[in-house]
Amino acid sequence: MAKKSKQMLAALEKVDSTKAYSVEEAVALVKETNFAKFDASVEVAYNLNIDVRKADQQIRGAMVLPNGTGKTQRVLVFARGAKAEEAKAAGADFVGEDDLVAKINGGWLDFDVVIATPDMMAIVGRLGRVLGPRNLMPNPKTGTVTMDVAKAVEESKGGKITYRADKAGNVQALIGKVSFDADKLVENFKAFHDVMAKAKPATAKGTYMANVSITSTQGVGIKVDPNSL
């Protein structure tokens, strides 16, 4: 722990906590201050001035990053018949029906994304208490309840991310790995920022983006100037 503390202190010394950096500067600092002994994930965080208690100010959705996430997603699909075969052909890791429901209820959670055809939601609904808190429940808004299971699987494997504002208006998203070239991280960041900007509710008041930051796993949080995006 002592060694990590020294590394964190050294990283903190390189970052001015009172400054909002340009996206290029921030990405460079994330790479420079990373001290994890593995290929750390890079995440961005937005604090939005919204009231999620209002239906028209709830922000949730999905997008495909231009350069992917660098993470291998394990995709589970609830489908039957021809749709199950389409999911398998597209590269789904697990495909099934009631058998998967029983397995998940038994404690198995070795997957990252859950997709379902609309007709399967009746049985998937039984898993609400398990999948809901983990943000794994299929939802039409994120494209995970669909008849086009092949496309959904391919997107999930190819860099699709989901996002959702919490009760305090915070949104977090994975945009890549520290090993990514800086320009690819910048491009992913800008693509996600565009989505956040377009998601601004018409009824939102005041400064929409109260704070934007970027960090790596175990790394330092770095403020970003939204105008640089």
Curated annotation (Swiss-Prot):
It comes from Streptococcus pyogenes serotype M3 (strain ATCC BAA-595 / MGAS315). Pfam families: Ribosomal_L1. It comes from the Bacteria. Binds directly to 23S rRNA. The L1 stalk is quite mobile in the ribosome, and is involved in E site tRNA release. One of its GO terms (cellular component) is large ribosomal subunit. Part of the 50S ribosomal subunit. HAMAP family: Ribosomal_uL1_B (MF_01318_B). This is Large ribosomal subunit protein uL1. The keyword Cytoplasm does not apply. Keywords: Repressor, Ribonucleoprotein, Ribosomal protein, RNA-binding, rRNA-binding, Translation regulation, tRNA-binding. GO terms for biological process: regulation of translation; translation. Belongs to the universal ribosomal protein uL1 family. One of its GO terms (molecular function) is structural constituent of ribosome. The keyword Ribonucleoprotein applies. InterPro entries: Ribosom_uL1_bac-type, Ribosomal_uL1, Ribosomal_uL1-like, Ribosomal_uL1/biogenesis, Ribosomal_uL1_3-a/b-sand, Ribosomal_uL1_CS. CDD domains: Ribosomal_L1.
